[in-house]
Amino acid sequence: MQLAVVEFARNICQMKDAHTTEIVKHCKYPVIDTLPEQKTLIREKKYGGTMRLGEYPCLIKKGSRSHLAYLKSRQGKQNKKGDILVQERHRHRYELNNEFRKDLEDKGLIMSGINPERDLVEIIEIPRHPFFIATQFHPEFKSKPLKPHPLFREFIRAALANKKRIKSE
């Protein structure tokens, strides 16, 4: 998800100098960055408390492609608004910088999965694309050979549908 956000910021939002601070520490548009409370720890080289590790909640917005994937697989709990709450596994240090969230959304990037505890973006989508979903978490950590993660299953469905569409053209 992180480099997808960088590319979207550069090419769609016209933020030519957008980057992740993991690669370019002092870039003009740090669309991917560490959380403010992590910065001091990183400066002091105390990396132990700077990673987001383990399982965290993700609220998936009703009407999104991700929502449809989880709905089809009957995973998660639906709230009164129809959003689905799931638990997903993480292992990362950098996040989408919420200072740029509105700019990205205004240009069409959908933030379809949000951590409800910290308001962190977990899933992004580009609706005009046949299948463009990127995640901050690791869906492969909850996938098995005979029970693939809902997003993997939807990706395969979309690929097959696109293949049929191309053959018929």
Describe the role of every protein-language-model region:
Residues 1-9:
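Catalytic nucleophile loop
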Residues 10-169:
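Amide-donor transfer/coupling interface in amidating biosynthetic enzymes
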